């Protein structure tokens, strides 16, 4: 049976967003990249020179920034827009944003604002959501829950491959950064990262995006258009 909602969880750098978007294209689903939404909040905090440790101030920023988020459903799925621009096209991967994300994402009121957007998208049609607490908190009713399990070394290698010429980080530096983020996500008081009891765990160290998507498509029992 074709699932209406697919939850994809996993640690930082596990490929949730990439695989989720590829799967959304194959299935004609809307794709909600939770990480990008929190990055949008982090950018708002930085742009407004707001203290990321001030919960009430961060909440005000999140409400203001996320007010402009809309979903444009199409015949091929759906696009998350911010003030009329696709969320995926915004520049949200600067190092200062990356460092700020876990600090703003730890606040429960902020997470609830984000959850309201996620649940609204789910209510409007077939949706794929990628994050760290999708299957456990955001959409525990999702018909298909996935957890992408990737070694720290492989995640760091992927980050290194994708980094810009200006970054020039070493494998050890990236591993340390990812390990720190993993610890913060696991130990967060609000909605910590964990594997849902009914999630399918997929180890993707030696798998391509297309191979992973093919496995998920097979789980859905569907024959779909080949990846372009």
Model-derived segments and their meaning:
Residues 5:
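Walker A (P-loop) ATP-phosphate-binding motif of ABC ATPase nucleotide-binding domains
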Residues 8:
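Hydrophobic anchor at the beta1->P-loop junction of P-loop NTPases
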Residues 11:
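P-loop (Walker A) phosphate-binding loop of NTP-binding proteins
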Residues 16:
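Conserved lysine of the Walker
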Residues 19:
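Hydrophobic positions on the alpha1 helix immediately C-terminal to the Walker A/P-loop
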Residues 25-92:
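N-terminal phosphate/diphosphate-binding loop that engages ATP/GTP or pyrophosphate donors
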Residues 88-165:
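ATP-dependent NMP and nucleoside kinases share a basic, alpha-helical "lid"
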Residues 118-124, 132-137, 141, 166-215:
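Small-molecule kinase domains that catalyze NTP-dependent phosphoryl transfer to phosphate-bearing small molecules
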